[in-house]
Amino acid sequence: GYAVDTMETACDWPRVGAMVDALEDAGRAALALHGERTHCYTHLSHVYAQGSSVYSTFVYSIGPGYDAALARWRSLKAAVGDAIVAHGGTITHQHGVGKDHARWLAAEKGATGMSAIAAMVREFDPHGVMARGNLLGDAE
């Protein structure tokens, strides 16, 4: 069987071209490590004066079972996430951060941003009932 996954970000206009290339190249390279070729394509789905969202879609074989499929997806996600951060995109986009993107949050927000997020979590969720650990790990 095949998997189809979309990885998305947003960036300002001067970065869009390099971002498209970086996401597609990272995805191809990650799946090549598993001996897999991928069909990938990118479109700009939300366009604004300041920049655009960048959606890259990857179609690839899931491999010989669940473990192989998960390993391929994790490689793809890690490579594309690293490329997003390296090229100045946002890992949050319109879907939020959550567990899948939390590892890149500090790289995007910096120490001050992470302190602000931690303060908001403490203020608005003092009892730790709202998705504890999703953004800040053990610090929540």
Give the ranges of each region predicted by the language model.
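Conserved glycine-rich FAD pyrophosphate-binding loop
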Residues: 1-140
